[in-house]
Amino acid sequence: MKNIRNFSIIAHIDHGKSTLSDRLIQTCGGLSEREMAAQVLDSMDLERERGITIKAQSVTLDYKAPDGQVYQLNFIDTPGHVDFSYEVSRSLAACEGALLVVDAGQGVEAQTLANCYTAMEMDLEVVPVLNKIDLPAADPDRVAQEIEDIVGIDATDAVRCSAKTGVGVPDVLERLVRDIPPPEGDPAAPLQALIIDSWFDNYLGVVSLVRIKNGTLRKGDKIKVMSTGQLYNADRLGIFTPKRIDREVLNCGEVGWLVCAIKDIHGAPVGDTLTLARQPADKVLPGFKKVKPQVYAGLFPVSSDDYEAFRDALGKLSLNDASLFYEPESSTALGFGFRCGFLGLLHMEIIQERLEREYDLDLITTAPTVIYEVLTTDNTTVYVDSPSKLPPLNGINELREPVAECHMLLPQAYLGNVITLCIEKRGVQTNMVYHGSQVALTYEIPMVEVVLDFFDRLKSTSRGYASLDYGFKRFQNSDMVRVDVLINGERVDALALITHRDNAPYRGREFVDKLQELIPRQQFDIAIQAAIGNHIIARSTVKQLRKNVLAKCYGGDVSRKKKLLQKQKEGKKRMKQVGNVELPQEAFLAILHVGKDSK
């Protein structure tokens, strides 16, 4: 056990975690030259295309140190995006140490800080690594100083490497083995194994990634899931090297995979503890704190026949992604679907894309909203995650919106722009600290403003240098109203939005104009209105297509022309009474772009 090292790689987006993982695998001979590919751990097509890591992946490597000892390295490559920070905290729970990778050109960014603090809270040994030293813009000394000033860990002898060229990678391995402590645990104690992650395999059923904290797990053992008490057989187990390799036994301190022929996707929840049926452990291992979704949106299958397939797909995905929340929902405009909760807009995009790709579904997404706390007139508190569930205005005492605490790190040159943006987003400044040329800003901004387009706007006002980390702070009373959209006098529940009363007329006006561009013209006029309660605040009309009925008249009497026009008018009127308006998918997402073009 003293030769096992469990560690994660944590960093901000694009600081080179996945590339460093590739080099470690290559140096330790996990894959042959032929099998090596760039970002070998980003196994999902989606991850490759976007160049981001979405799922944490684990690998077991054997490292022969210069002193002749052979060490077993179990490491987990983690995502860097703020939407996937729960993946990082789960990975860290299985480790004794973490490599904090910092780009020697960019320096410390907000996610570097957030992930590093998560690791420190869990008492992990943090080893700083300065990556990308081959870049012309790299300034390792300045960045090492930044790590000390901002993060507060000693970085004087931080390992310097370039994952792309492979320079300094052996030093990283040496430092790992030296600084990260071996796992603690008792091989003779009753088995306690923590489930770090699970996913669904069409042939094997549920595959779980486990970290053995105490005891040992052998093939064929009867195991018990501690939260549900269900018993299963350990049919197959092994490690990833990144290929799946079968083993007979997983020893204390190791990380490996396990298949127990679990068909029910909720049979072994992530964060649960496994133990042996014949010699159970007394207590459960501390799991993970449940993450609360920040953004809610309705997902509906385009054809109602896909509803069952959609439900199964969501079940399988939620097994792999513990933070996905979903419940059935029905909409008068879109039929049956699910209300889903996500951690952020990127998470929502990724889930929708995975559903459409991996499960071959066609989906319509409604505009994302956040969750509101409503105090009704009879003094009960309800939580509302969809505008259509909001009680009528006369039944509401207080409407409280969620406020996020946003930590931003940015160069001083962009401070003015960023402060202007935060004020425009109804933000309140709570803190500002200067670290050399960097400024750390803390603002409290309503979650609805952060979730929609704050990140994109922050990047564009600071030319990509500012970075953001945010979390839910509290609910606060606010003057919010629901803006309904009526099409030909009928309310479309899927298009409603909740916004601040001061912004409602502008938002309504813009949204209506946007819809007018998106809805195709029909044989009759389509009236699009935005309303607060019964008060119409904006209107626009999609003009009808009409045939020129006078074309065959040439000259002729004016009463003849009037008769033809009158006849056409009556026909259009009849058509309007029975005509349905088909809304394109873009119409439901137009709400996201409201307020972007005008600035």
UniProtKB/Swiss-Prot annotation:
Keyword Nucleotide-binding: yes
Single GO biological process annotation from the record: positive regulation of translation
Alphabetical list of InterPro entries matching this protein: EF-4 (IPR006297), EFG_III/V (IPR035647), EFG_V-like (IPR000640), EFTu-like_2 (IPR004161), G_TR_CS (IPR031157), LepA_C_sf (IPR038363), LepA_CTD (IPR013842), LepA_IV (IPR035654)
tr-type G domain residues: 2-184
Binding site for GTP: D14, H15, G16, K17, S18, T19, N131, K132, I133, D134
Key words, A-Z: Cell inner membrane, Cell membrane, GTP-binding, Hydrolase, Membrane, Nucleotide-binding, Protein biosynthesis
GO cellular component, one term: plasma membrane
PROSITE patterns, alphabetized: G_TR_1 (PS00301), G_TR_2 (PS51722)
Location in or out of the cell: Cell inner membrane
Membrane topology: Peripheral membrane protein
EC number(s) stated in the UniProt entry for this protein: 3.6.5.n1
Reactions it catalyzes: GTP + H2O = GDP + phosphate + H(+)
Domain of life the protein comes from: Bacteria
GO molecular function: GTP binding; GTPase activity; guanosine tetraphosphate binding; ribosome binding; translation elongation factor activity
Pfam families registered for this protein in UniProt: EFG_C, GTP_EFTU, GTP_EFTU_D2, LepA_C
Stated role: Required for accurate and efficient protein synthesis under certain stress conditions. May act as a fidelity factor of the translation reaction, by catalyzing a one-codon backward translocation of tRNAs on improperly translocated ribosomes. Back-translocation proceeds from a post-translocation (POST) complex to a pre-translocation (PRE) complex, thus giving elongation factor G a second chance to translocate the tRNAs correctly. Binds to ribosomes in a GTP-dependent manner.
Family of this protein: Belongs to the TRAFAC class translation factor GTPase superfamily. Classic translation factor GTPase family. LepA subfamily.
This protein's name: Elongation factor 4
